[in-house]
Amino acid sequence: EIMPSLVGSEMCIRDSDYVPESIKTKCFEKYGKTLEGAAAALFEFNKALIDALYDIVPAVKPQAAYYEMYGWQGVKALCDTIAYAKSKGMFVITDGKRNDIGTTMEAYATAHLGHTDVAGESIDAFGADALTVNGYLGTDGIKPLAKICDSDDKGIFVLVKTSNPSSGELQDMKLETNESVYEHMGKMCEGWGEDLMGKHGYSAVGAVVGATYPEQLGEMRAKLPHTFFLVPGYGAQGGGADDVKNAFDENGLGAIINSSRGIMCAWKKQGLTEDDFAVAARKEAERMRDEIVGCIGKIKLG
């Protein structure tokens, strides 16, 4: 049995609107109001958050788009963030929602999870531990990822039932089998993960299932016993501990709960200044952890 402090949230590191003015001023003075300056500010912000959270939060989920908008400089900040988080022992999930087939998907998998061959040298391009993906193209889009998950001990999270308000327009549609699209996608995740099982009964193929639909979350936990859940929607999107508790199995395993703005902008709720963002983030992460643990109890590894 281990202590439930390993239950934690992810922080989704986003764009420079969340970065305190003091950090932006420092970076803009050095690099100017340029893409390089913005990227430097992002990385400084990220480092401070990681330093404040790495011992209580198991994973970090940088959203690739908020780095790509700053060009190659932003992409470098993403690489640096991944490397720094991993140096602190954190599990890194790149939120890229990649979606393609064949050799193109293999290239995405190699870039984010695998090793790139450069004239016979094997080099990590991004080096994340897991990647969010869209499974709409079917098995052709998942096979290249599964291959690298197997060879390099990596993971993927397939979009199944997402937390956005319009997700039901497609995901809730009923098929001829009377199951919904999201239920069928979940079933496919179970199948894709059959040969990628870990020692605690979960596969390398996970599912994104939103906290904003708690009833479906509980149903999917029962139907997908070997699929690890990434659960967005906690905090700023309205989800709470009661909404996410059904994502976990009877041993308190099987899910990681995502909080982004709720952690990054916690200083606003706590009546602090933006320069206290790291202290506030830690306090909020501890509160969130304790709230979730209060619902699910201690984690048990049998």
Range-by-range predicted roles:
Residues 50-57, 82-87, 146-152, 221-224, ...:
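Acidic (Asp/Glu)-rich catalytic clusters
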Residues 244-250, 265-301:
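C-terminal helical cap(s) of enzyme catalytic domains, especially alpha/beta-barrels
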Residues 207, 211-258, 262-266:
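A C-terminal functional module that forms or caps the active site or interfaces directly
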